[in-house]
Amino acid sequence: MSVLVVGSVALDSVETPFGKADEVLGGSGTFFSASASHFTDVQLVGVVGSDYPIDKLRELEQRNVDLSGIEKMDGASFRWRGRYRHDLNSAETLETHLGVFSQFQPKIPESFASPDFLFLANIDPRLQLNVLKQVKRPRLVACDTMNFWIESRRPELLELLGHVDLVTLNDGEARQLTEKTNLVQAAKWIMQRGPKHVVIKKGENGAFLFRQDNIFFAPAYPLENVFDPTGAGDAFAGGFIGYLARTGDLSETGMRRAMIYGSAMGSFAVERFSIERLMTVTHEEIEQRVRDFKQLVAFNEEMPG
């Protein structure tokens, strides 16, 4: 089954304690697509400026990512420059130049208008709502958001919650959105407003899946070397949604497996700058990492009672 993603396509310049990279592929749509393409066909909708090195995106086409939804506009592309110190959970933004992204009005090609799965990446909730008006209702609609939209577009974000099946956000954003300090209470608050599933990400501490009264925790993979955490959350989402699209299994068991595949893809993303590692990782490496995750939490001790 296909996945449609609407998100940013950017150029990132990143500094970490382990090196730096200039003008490399970035953006939520880019990271999601690179990750999800390991599982299913992906349709990407975004915008780039006339200065964007479009040839760099061609590698994604070879991985079953349809780029015909990328709009090219006159002007500068979206650029972000950030720095991570030894706390890799938070980036210091040094520069943000929205360029043509500030004028982005997603136009869904007719060939993309009946997706099986839809991921509304981190963009203005007004645009996310507009996308929903342009497509036939997918089997599953997921969205991401961030603190900026929670502060500046709260009414629209709350409206969006009534139209999606799944929300992904980090723990700080969950607390900010719901004004609840407890994440279990925060997830219930969100589900009361429409979504059936809530994924709360905690960076290097893993992620929670909330579904009805069930809670599942996926640990983060313990890596010795982390080069660039910039796209980890979007790579997680790509693995998660991509796996669901490949299997079509939206049961509790299917969702839990998808969480592990998402965590696996997020762990690969941080091993190199940009989408470099996501483009080279093999099917066998992905499956081995999933097996490693299972080993992380497996134990054979019989439980009393």
Where are these regions (language model features)?
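Short beta-strand scaffold segments in enzyme catalytic cores
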Residues: 34, 80-83, 206-210
